[in-house]
Every structure is written in C-alpha cells, then in structure tokens.
Regions:
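Structural motif
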Residues: 9-10, 29-30, 51-52, 79-81, ...
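Generic secondary-structure signature for well-ordered alpha-helical cores
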Residues: 51, 74, 102-108, 143, ...
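Short, well-ordered, mixed-charge alpha-helical segments that flank or form enzyme active sites
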Residues: 89-93, 119-122, 157
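Acidic/Gly/His-enriched mid-domain segments of enzyme catalytic cores or analogous surface patches
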Residues: 4-10, 16-104
C-alpha cells in the first residue's frame, strides 16, 4: 500500500488513516474527519507541519472516508485510490465498496486497496490490469446485472445474468494479459485477489 500512496498526487487522510501514514513515513496533504481516532499528540504533530486539518462533528450522515472522497472530487480528482478502507468493521468495508459506485457515477476511476485485494466497479466494458493466474471475483451490485462477454478468464461468462443470490462469479482466474469483461447492464463489483 505504501507504493500505491507514493504514486498519488494528493493524499487525504480520513481520521485514523493518519496512523498508517505516520507509520509509513507519508505526509498527507490534508486530514479530515471527526478526529475521534487521532491522539492529541498526533494532531499537534501535523498542525506543526502546517498540514490542513478539517474537523467534522461525530454525529453526521457521512463517514470520514465519504468526506475525504467528496473533497477529492471537489478538487477535481481524475482517479481515487482508497487505501486501507477494508478492515475489521464490515459495515465500513461494505460502505466503502458502495462509495466506489458513487465515485464511478461521477465519471471518476476508483479502487479500494488493501494488502490482499484491489476492489473496483464498472457498468461497461473494462480492461483488467492483472497478471495471468490472478484470482478475480465478479459480483453483481443489484438486480438485472448481465455480462455480454468475457475474454481471458478461465471460466468464460457469455450472455449471462449474474443473480444477486447466486454468486457464481467468485474465484475466476485470469488467463490472458489482455483480459476484459463487457458488461451489458448493471453494476459489477470486481475483487482482484493478490496472492
């Protein structure tokens, strides 16, 4: 994840993300959130470095990650990478996956990355940036999700609906360097497993 962060032009830490940033010697460009996961010592450290900090109330509709994404979109981001947004809190992890759709609906490319997975969404043809042998799970987001055709997968999917209650798209395997998936309708959540 440190390599991913180093390739970013602008880093917004959502609350507790600053703990990861300081551990990995990465200075964020901005810190946002209700700041309930940051010690006063850490806040003071970043204030002394003149890093902008935007504090929000604890009682709010948006998560701290949602706020960070909104700011990134307002700043004109063309691509958003959410680091560490998959963790012990399944509710936050699921919420962050749903935020990928919000970002994509704005026409911005986005992915959610942790040590083991890269998660992204699409509702149109997508070319995969992965190596043969990588595991790819293909999950529908909602009803009426249909794949027109796939290329470069061990288990091809051709003109098939992906039922929300029968996840047959789990653990497919990429077989070609130029793999792609042509989505006919609906949104799909892709999980690329890093092993």
């Amino acid at each position: 994840m440190k390599k991913e962060a180093a390739s970013c032009d602008y880093i917004i830490c959502a609350d507790g993300g600053v703990k990861w940033a300081i551990t990995n010697n990465i200075d964020p460009d901005m810190i946002v959130g209700d700041l309930d996961s940051i010690s006063d010592t850490l806040l003071f450290y970043y204030q002394r470095k003149n890093i902008p900090i935007q504090s929000y109330p604890k009682d709010k509709d948006e998560t701290d990650t949602h706020i960070a994404i909104t700011i990134a979109l307002q700043k004109g981001a063309s691509e958003i990478t959410i680091l560490g947004g998959i963790g012990n809190r399944m509710d936050h992890s699921m919420g962050n996956i749903l935020l990928l759709i919000r970002i994509a609906q704005k026409g911005v490319k986005a992915k959610l990355v942790n040590q083991n997975n890269v998660i992204f969404v699409s509702n149109k043809r997508i070319f995969l940036d992965a190596e043969p042998g990588n595991i790819l799970s293909i999950l529908p987001y909602g009803d009426n999700v249909k794949i027109h055709q796939t290329y470069g997968l061990q288990y091809p999917i051709i003109n098939r609906v992906l039922p929300i209650d029968f996840p047959f798209g789990i653990s497919n395997i990429i077989t070609e360097k130029q793999a792609w998936i042509d989505i006919e309708s609906g949104w799909i959540v892709f999980i690329l497993v890093k092993e």
